[in-house]
Amino acid sequence: MTEKLLVPDIGDFENVEVIELLVKEGQDIKKNDPVVTIESDKSSVEIPSIFSGKVESVNVKVGDKVSKGDLLINISSNQSLSQKESVPKETENLIQEAESTLRKHQDQNIPQKIIETEKPKIIQVVKEGDIDPLETSEWLESLSAVIEKDGNQRAHYLIKELINKAYMEGANIPYTQNTPYINTIPVNEEKKSNGDQNIERRIRSLIRWNAAAMVVRANKKFPELGGHIGTFASAATLYDVGMNHFWRAKNNKFGGDLIYFQGHSAPGMYARAYLEGRLNEKQLDSFRQEVNPGGLSSYPHPWLMPNFWQFPTVSMGLGPMLAIYQARFMKYLINRGLIKDEGRKVWAFLGDGEMDEPESLGAIGLAAREKLDNLIFVVNCNLQRLDGPVRGNGKIIQELEGIFRGAGWNVIKVIWGSYWDPLLANDKTGHLVKTMNETVDGEYQAMKARDGAYVREKFFGKYLETKELVSSLSDKDIWRLNRGGHDPHKVFAAYDKASKNVGSPTVVIAKTIKGYGMGKSGESVNTTHQTKKLDIDDLMYYRDRFDVPLTDQQVKNIEYYKPDQNSPEIKYINERRIQLGGFIPERTTYAKPVKAPPKDIFDNMKVSTGEKEMSTTMALVRMLTNLLRDKNVAPRLVPIIPDEARTFGMEGFFQKIGIYAHEGQKYEPEDSAQLSSYKEEKSGQVLEEGINEAGAMSSWIAAGTSYTNLSLIHISEPTRPLG
């Protein structure tokens, strides 16, 4: 029989050119053999055959333009016939008999035989590795009783002691740092927001629309400008909850929280500032067009927008490392008595793909060792990076949880939204959580690119128990099951718990959907990150999805939407930010100038050394020593040493001004009798970074920008060349 090989769904490769024919008429080919090569303006791809057989005709030629559904070749295939003939007659009869019996049972609504044959498999999977289910049940019941009687802390202590005892007895089985693939905070412990959720959703929707419109308008004018829609679409709720309830601005009475915004989400911050009245429409239309005054930078950077952005967060990996050292520097100043402890927080927003950058995770150990409970990471796990899934065959949330828990961080997972709560409460057999644990990110991504029927089949259909769990739900209900990062209630509870944590840094790992709300144009598809343009149908869908009050003509014009100044939305935005001290992001300074040292402070360096040679490092030490003698400058001097003080003759600073250590010195150093003894103290002035040039540079940036971020001028000095 003749099979037609058509152009499959090839994503962006629409109306593209055939640049190479890889088969010819009469040629025998196998399934998956490449047939033609097509090429767009960005890349090329081969199209494979999905049949085996002989090529009857080639229906395209080099130079032709093809799209999905176009005929490429005809293949003479006897595959179906040979497969049919290979089935023995008696086997075919058995198959027909089985099908007939199955139909009979279905008609009579008697599924007992199917259940009886499948039930042993399910029990075997669920009880895998359990040689004594009764004993297991007794242990679990005992643990539940402890939690009920004495609370979570007692249960945690007993489990820790059991693990220690197992190790002492030689049971050195690797212990996982992972918890089940569910939310960290139980429903009954969630702190509820006092905000108006209806107004907050309307505000969030308008910000989403204006952010997307800004990027689309810019690229309609100049297609080469670029920009990103999908990142902020996935993180809008994460930012909105922080803006409305948690992030306190800097003013003349309070130092303010410090927020490191994820670089690719910048359009969302501009869109919010537009509603706040801090940016106008002309400025939005200058997105990525900084050649003109008032243009908005592609990404956060204080050099480009010195009154707006506080921190640079692109290239990837800069944000997390700089945030860690910023939080440490804040603690350093508090412990030295230079600033008050106001309970300020440093928040850093990161992407799950960004966490592959070595700098993203390279300093998390320091954050735990220094007990930086003023630091909160929020990792937006939309499961996608630029080209595809972050961990298609794995689970990035579980991976990050293990890494951060292992390093000593407080981890809060926000995976499932509120619509999942009843299902999890009714998961008496544990099969729902089991399915959640087993499903890999590639599957989760694909599900959100499909529909409710697909999720019912591919996710809930894995076990009879999970299938039964949603038997009363429609496909629409299943599709409505939301992810935690898009649920303001779950996000609020996580932020509240993170803000109150003491003794360790916190990471909130939130599961979201890249391109959330973009529909077919970009929701949970691999090309989302590159989406800069939306056609009219996409824009109409986006408007309807988020109930943006624009007419069809206004949508076609890609107009921004800003409510009247007296509208409930604008009033609410302003009221929330007034209560939190002002607007964010905003870059200002309240630093007082430092009195300059006297002119003669360096007189001793003007005198010739005669025949005595002096290295540059020697001169530097002398210069710093002179500055440390000045009562105005000395407290503001921050020597930053990446582990080579002794190499360059700077060990004298150890005793003179001390090495900063947040816990002081718990030991007597072996050189305690020496003048240059290694003296650590809580009020120490030297930042001894170890063999860590990136960390030293991060500390230098924190100190060098303290005039604006901490309202205190410092003289920071990396004491050896970096690079």
Label each residue range with its predicted role.
Residues G195-I207, A211-F222, H228-E370, N393-G394, ...:
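Cofactor-binding active-site loop characterized by glycine-rich and histidine/acidic residues
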Residues G255-D257, R344-K345, D373, G503-P505, ...:
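Short coil/turn segments at beta-strand junctions that form active-site/ligand-binding loops
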Residues E85, E97, L102-V241, F349-L350, ...:
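Conserved acidic/glycine
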Residues D12, V23, S40, V60, ...:
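Short, conserved catalytic or interaction motifs in soluble domains
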Residues I713-G723:
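Single conserved hydrophobic/aromatic residue that forms the stacking wall/gate
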Residues N78-E97:
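Intrinsically disordered, low-complexity mixed-charge segments
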Residues K30-P48, S67-Q83:
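Short hydrophobic beta/alpha edge segments that flank linear recognition/processing sites
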Residues M1-T37, E46, I50-S52:
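Acidic, low-complexity mobile loops and tails
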